UniProtKB/Swiss-Prot annotation:
Subcellular location as annotated: Membrane
Keywords: Membrane, Repeat, Transmembrane, Transmembrane helix
Signal sequence segment: none
Protein's name according to its UniProt entry: WAT1-related protein At5g40240
A GO cellular-component term linked to this record: membrane
InterPro entries for this protein: EamA_dom, WAT1-related
Organism domain of life: Eukaryota
Similarity annotation: Belongs to the drug/metabolite transporter (DMT) superfamily. Plant drug/metabolite exporter (P-DME) (TC 2.A.7.4) family.
Chain segments annotated as transmembrane: 18-38, 50-70, 82-102, 111-131, 142-162, 194-214, 226-246, 260-280, 292-312, 315-335
Keyword Chloroplast included in the entry's annotation: no
Species of provenance: Arabidopsis thaliana
Residue ranges constituting the EamA domain according to the UniProt record: 33-161, 208-334
GO-annotated molecular function: transmembrane transporter activity
Main location: membrane
């Protein structure tokens, strides 16, 4: 009986902690890959309005059969239901964040986007407190850690945006990757509007935090991940049609060729608008908005490597210092969150000595 109980607890730990951790890490890899491909495609002339529109089209078409096959276990609400209005808001917020993010990367680089993404835990925690999804006890060490971490994250982001500094790693020209780009300056973010890009990216990650909060509320009412994500992408597509067609009036820009632009659009539609949205929606339902946002700092190292390999981006001192401050803030927030979750779990396990023993033995895992 004891062994069976331990196996049950271990399986529960695996499904509720290990699997979400691995899934969120995969999402960060997919997101950085999409940012890098998008930046490379813009250097070849891809309009970010075209990119956003076609990406939503791809994900919506792929989700349609999935929602029919797997998403009908719960009856759909009426068309006039407040739920559909909330999902429409999800589509609007998601579309706005995509536009801000694409424009921000076009002005700067995927590395800056990954650095600024560390604001997401601070934004999400603040919004979660405002909407009473997180408890604030000022005398609690967990709450103090989350507040200090949020302040450090914002400070680090300001350093990244406002202080570029000298090069730590020199940029390199990779003409084999982008053969039509001949000027070295086109391959780096040196000539880009760093501050404007940073502000746009900060706006993107604030909107993403709003999306997390709103999506969590939607999942509380209608916990059908595939159906919700399908309608989210459908509404985002409908919103993007007039906006993108009006903003990008050059018809030749809408003609796609089998090159890196098409690859970037398909990749984004499959791995960001579909896979990442589904995974985040599932994670929000399982773990909550603050947990999902805590994985953003993992993208920094991935973005630096991809930017250096595929874009020839230089690494600047300001990005290094700011990212270090951001990471300290991130791990401070995650420590506070882990401590808070541990206290809640132990408090709820007073009647289950076996579960309590398992928690104590596995105390080395900060995300449990």
């Amino acid at each position: 009986m004891r062994e069976a109980g331990e196996e049950k607890v271990a399986w529960k730990y695996f499904t509720r902690d290990v699997v979400p951790f691995a899934a969120m890490f995969a999402v960060e890899c997919a997101t950085v890959g999409s940012n890098t491909l998008f930046k490379a495609a813009t250097l070849r002339g891809l309009s970010f309005y075209v990119f956003v529109f076609y990406s939503y089209i791809v994900s919506t078409l792929l989700l349609l059969p999935l929602s029919v096959i797997f998403g009908r276990s719960r009856r759909l609400p009426a068309a006039k239901s407040p739920l559909f209005f909330k999902i429409f808001l999800l589509g609007l917020v998601g579309f706005m964040s995509q536009i801000a993010g694409c424009k921000g990367i076009a002005y700067s680089s995927p590395t800056l986007a990954s650095a600024i993404s560390n604001l997401t835990p601070a934004f999400t925690f603040t919004l979660a407190v405002i909407f009473r999804m997180e408890q604030v006890r000022l005398r609690s060490s967990a709450t103090q850690a989350k507040i200090i971490g949020a302040i450090l994250s914002i400070s680090g982001a300001l350093v990244v945006v406002l202080y570029k500094g000298p090069q730590v790693l020199a940029s390199a020209s990779f003409t084999t990757v982008l053969p039509t780009v001949t000027l070295h300056q086109q391959l780096t973010s040196i000539e880009s509007s760093w501050i404007i890009g940073g502000l746009l990216l900060a706006s993107q990650y604030f909107l993403i935090s709003v999306w997390y909060i709103l999506q969590t509320r939607v999942m509380e009412v209608y916990p059908e991940e595939i159906t919700v994500v399908f309608f989210y992408n459908l509404f985002a597509t409908l919103i993007s049609v007039p906006v993108c067609l009006f903003a990008e009036s050059n018809l030749t820009s809408w003609v796609l060729k089998p090159d890196i632009s098409l690859a970037a659009i398909i990749y984004s539609g499959v791995f960001v608008s579909l896979f990442s949205a589904l995974t985040h929606t599932w994670g929000l339902h399982l773990k909550g908005p603050v947990y999902i946002s805590l994985f953003r700092p993992l993208s920094i190292a991935i973005a630096v490597a991809m930017g250096a390999i595929f874009l020839g981006d230089a690494l600047h001192l300001g990005s290094v210092i700011g990212s270090m401050i951001l990471c300290i803030g991130f791990y401070t927030v995650i420590w506070g969150k882990a401590r808070e979750d541990t206290i809640k779990t132990v408090a709820g396990s007073e009647q289950s000595p076996l579960l309590l023993t398992h928690i104590i033995e596995d105390g080395a895992f900060p995300l449990s």
